[in-house]
C-alpha cells in the first residue's frame, strides 16, 4: 500500500503494552515456529494510504494540526480473536466499534486521505474499517 499509516499505540510502560509486546515477540512466535516472526510494536491502524505529500516536510507539524474528536481516553473492547491468511492479519484481536476508536479513525481518514470529506470518511468507517490489533 502506498503512503503512510496512522497508528494508535497503547500507553508505553503499561501492563497492556508490555503484555501485547510479549505476545508479539515471544509467546506467539514460540507457539508457531513454522511461521516467520516479525517484530513490531503493538498498534491499531487508524487509517492507511496517507500521501507523503500531505505531511512533507514536517510530519509532526501535520499531526499536531489535525482536528480530532475531543476525548481524553479511547477504549477498545476485544470482540474476537481472528485468524487470517493475509500477511498483516495472520492473527488479530478484533476490536469493537465503541469507545471513540471509530470516531478517531474517521477523522484521521477524512483529513489524511479524503481531503476533508467527512461524509466519505463516515462511509469508509461503516463499510470498510475493521478495527483490530495485529499479533502476528
Write out the residue ranges for each language-model feature.
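Short, low-order "capping/linker" segments at domain edges
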Residues: 87-97
